[in-house]
């Protein structure tokens, strides 16, 4: 997929003193085959070197835009609220500060959205997996490809 002038996907990451784990998240975003997204990091009052790390990444040619917002510590839910108030793209997803995005995920998200956005869908849902690709928690029921929130 080609990069557009105005990405439709924001990947947001709430972070609090996570300079030791954020590089894994950053590296997974750099490995994406499609860089048509914005990475929004909401720093929830970190006292470590999170800000310096992000400033360094912002100065690099990563192929995607990195936005950084610092706020006073208030908990992850307040970081989510700040993220949602600052997201201006059609789609968004949250990647925690100690997680990584699977290779090719952005391309899959955007392709799937192209397939379903005209069908009255509000979004798409994926599952979390561990580093070996094993689904964390309960997977979707066999044969489920589309549903409504009330139908699940």
Where are these regions (language model features)?
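Nucleotide-sugar donor-binding/catalytic module of glycosyltransferases
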Residues: 1-152
